[in-house]
Design a protein with these regions (language model features):
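Conserved alpha-helical substructure of the radical SAM core
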Residues: 31, 73-169
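Accessory C-terminal segments flanking Radical SAM cores
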Residues: 1-84
Length: 169
């Protein structure tokens, strides 16, 4: 069950509103993986970036942003990696998805940013809307994963406002 210090790249895919993909939100920026209609979920999951990350973590190395979890462990604080310890048995496909597919939101919570709230992006940050890459081909690819999924977590803006979430559900 525990191939390394963190199960996230063995069990989870996190999709951000920007199209970035990683095993968790900490690894989104550094990995450089991005979903597009030309780059499938399967391509990302089986590709060299995830493969190298799995190898490093299996050898107890913390590449790039994974150092944040190492710091937490060394400080005696529960790291983000600990939430992926609860994942079911590791198989060859993801058992968990975290979907932050849009920043569409009808709130402007004081603690939030425009990355997760379209209203904040427009009214406080005065930025144009995010260009969200997810389409019907993404929905079809997620549907192919349903047999292996134990859980799907929805976040980003107000998830129930996202039209694509209704297609996925």
């Amino acid at each position: 069950h525990h191939p390394g210090i963190c199960n996230a790249p063995f069990s989870n895919l996190y999709f951000a509103a920007s199209g970035k993909v990683g095993p968790c939100w900490i690894q989104l920026g550094d990995m450089g993986e991005r979903w597009s209609p030309d780059r499938s979920i399967r391509d990302i999951w089986t590709g060299p970036t995830f493969t190298k990350l799995r190898e490093a973590l299996a050898e107890q190395r913390f590449p790039g942003p994974c150092g944040r979890c190492r710091h937490d462990i060394e400080s005696g604080v529960a790291p983000l990696a600990a939430i992926y310890d609860r994942e079911p048995e590791i198989i060859e496909w993801p058992t968990s998805l975290e979907l932050e597919l849009s920043n569409l939101c009808n709130f402007e919570c004081v603690m939030c940013t425009g990355d997760l709230s379209s209203k904040i992006r427009r009214n406080r940050e005065h930025l144009p809307p995010l260009d969200v890459p997810y389409d019907d081909s993404f929905v079809d690819q997620v549907a192919e994963l349903i047999p292996t999924l134990a859980q799907v977590r929805f976040s980003g803006g107000e998830p129930l406002l996202h039209p694509i979430m209704h297609k996925i559900c």
